[in-house]
Amino acid sequence: MSNHWLLPENIADVLPSEARKIEELRRRMLDLFRTYGYELVMPPMLEYLESLLTGTGHDLDLRTLKLVDQLSGRTMGLRADITPQVARIDAHLLNRPGVTRLCYAGNVLHARPAGFHATREPIQVGAEIYGHAGLEADVEIQELMLAALQAAGLSDIRIDLCHAGILEALLDGLPSIRRIEDALFAALETKDVSALREITQGMPQTERDALLALPTLYGGVEVIDRARATLPASPAIGRALDELVALATQVRGASINIDLSDLRGYHYHSGVMFAAYVAGLPNYVARGGRYDKVGEAFGRARPATGFSLDLREVAALSPIEVRAQAIFAPWDADPALRAAIVALRAAGEIVIQSLPGHTKELDEFNCDRQLVRQEAGWVVAPR
């Protein structure tokens, strides 16, 4: 007998207690973004594949579920990342001059999970700034990312900084790199120096030595001084290191690490990259950086920087308890009781009316008060 209730692997229902916390944190974060002047957008869950993947890397294509549109016969994709959609909205639909701040919150779907226990249906929350090429935008986005994590009750946060321009400068002028690109990035991300030695055989010695050094350039801000002494003294690398120093000095409320081989999303990013970690966990809880090239694919090159996080992961880590205070009301045909319940709900109170024959309360609510009949009518009293 088949189990009709089974869900696909790495897909799960969100039950009331988890859903309540997720919704509370979603509201907190969107309200926070609003105080910074970010406008909410809601891109569609489904787009034609060429639009959905425009300006993105090969890894997003692999994470995107595809299907055929029954109306047009064209291939469509279920979004695996909202950020490219928001870039399309800024470049093609809004088409505003100057700075635009946008934020979003919505489900995405992954063809494969990012990790063994990872969900294939994250709830992605993020914010983006378009139209400012200076480091000030990156500082604001990094500050907002920290504030969002703190709004979720997370503490002891560490920020890891990297820069896509360093690797780009090292690989510039190496036309054969495309053949080994994926293996190179995998070795750098895992800091597998032995694999790097094998992959970089035959490269010019200067570039090879620099690539082998990247996994060792990890630690506090002092790593940047070691990087200046170790990496080639090119203008592009010098500018990238200067930007990392400037960004690191602006961080408040988190410790800073430099990790010059943390290159996840390299194909996507064009400048500073950062990831937030909490103590005791190996995986990042939020990630962001600069991606100036994405809008160009939609016909309008725009400086852009932003961050995103998976709200389900953050909610699982959050110590915040969300158990709503409620008022218990008996079941009674008295019109005065009905009027009292309507008035309380209009004022924002949760009123749970007991149905006939049921006396057990739901654990999801803390009914610390009750409606009782007195001479003056129905009044709220402690329970």
Swiss-Prot record:
Supply one GO BP term.
L-histidine biosynthetic process
Q: Pathway it belongs to?
A: Amino-acid biosynthesis; L-histidine biosynthesis; L-histidine from 5-phospho-alpha-D-ribose 1-diphosphate: step 1/9
Gene Ontology cellular component?
A: cytoplasm
Q: From the Swiss-Prot or TrEMBL record, what is one GO molecular function term?
A: histidine-tRNA ligase activity
| Domain of life according to the entry | Bacteria
Q: Identify the keywords attached in UniProt to this record, alphabetized.
A: Amino-acid biosynthesis, Cytoplasm, Histidine biosynthesis
Q: Which Pfam families match?
A: tRNA-synt_His (PF13393)
- Cellular localization per UniProt: Cytoplasm
Q: Main location per UniProt?
A: cytoplasm
**Family to which the UniProt record says this protein belongs:** Belongs to the class-II aminoacyl-tRNA synthetase family. HisZ subfamily.
Q: Which NCBIfam families does the entry link to?
A: hisZ_biosyn_reg, PRK12292.1-1, PRK12421.1
The note filed under miscellaneous reads:
This function is generally fulfilled by the C-terminal part of HisG, which is missing in some bacteria such as this one.
What is the annotated role of this protein in its UniProt record?
Required for the first step of histidine biosynthesis. May allow the feedback regulation of ATP phosphoribosyltransferase activity by histidine.
Can you state the subunit structure given in the record? Heteromultimer composed of HisG and HisZ subunits.
This chain's protein is named ATP phosphoribosyltransferase regulatory subunit
Q: What is the lineage of its organism?
A: Bacteria, Pseudomonadati, Pseudomonadota, Betaproteobacteria, Burkholderiales
